[in-house]
Amino acid sequence: MVEKNNLPTLIRIFSYSILAITFVFLINNVLTVWFDWPGIKKLFSQFGLFGFRRLSTPLEGLSVALAFIQLLFYFISILLVYFYVRKSIEQTLETDAEILTKIAGYIIRSSFWAVLILGIVDFIISFMVVEKLFNEAIKFKLVNPSFRITFIHFPLVLISFIIGYFTRSVGFIWLAVLVVGSEFAIVLSRFIFNYEQAFQGDLVRFWYAALYLFASAYALMHEGHVRVDVLYTGFSEKRRAWTNSIGSLVLGIPLCLIIIFLGMGGKASIINGPALSFEITQQGSNGLYLLYLMAIYLAVFAVSMLIQFTSYFMSSSHKILNN
């Protein structure tokens, strides 16, 4: 029988374990997809475990060791969670929820700055390439997706995460204004100046997708998601806490995990595939080189929502136990 005094500790271990396992999965995904580590699926297939078919070409030597290391990461993450919870035994669920909310907020802020800066910079580059404002040597490098993404996009993403650390506000209102302004600029250039290029429409789609996916976790942080308001508004604080707790645990968290695990299930999956191949616009060098990032949007959406749903679950559990 679990004593009531132990429930907060168990909830903390359970909640942090979900996030820790997901974090390890993301690390293993990078190791498997980008660095050709075997992954734990092949390890299970090696021994025919959990219904996996045995490999036609068994793993050998270093590959087996790397696969076991990837499996070991999961056990280490659970142990770290346990020791962290035991070390901070006096910390309340509400405090944990606030910490997770800050982490989710940082991810969202940084992602906002990334799409803003990358959109503007890549728009300028595409415009100058189309209008032949670069010499042939520079143009040859800039139309190469690997060069453009590695030496321009990645550093800008890093700068965006630095900016996100020092800022505290999220400019989704400004991003919405920029989407409208970009669409308005397309109308003006098309019907007044008879000028239209693929990168103009790409920019609108790039920002528009970010606006909805990134703002989702932000709205959840500020109670902005719609429930059955006719019922919810009449609930007591305890019933609201039960609703939020069960909803997060049964609907929110599983949805995010499904997106992450299926979207990164292999090299050709919906998130890994475009990111691995540096997929760009279908318009060639006339468009923005940001299509691969729109696949990564799904991962950012799922991770930020997962963190915030876990925060929601912990804060709601705190209210239930206190009442």
Show the residue positions of the predicted features.
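Alpha-helical transmembrane segments and membrane-interface helix-loop junctions
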Residues: 1-234, 238-323
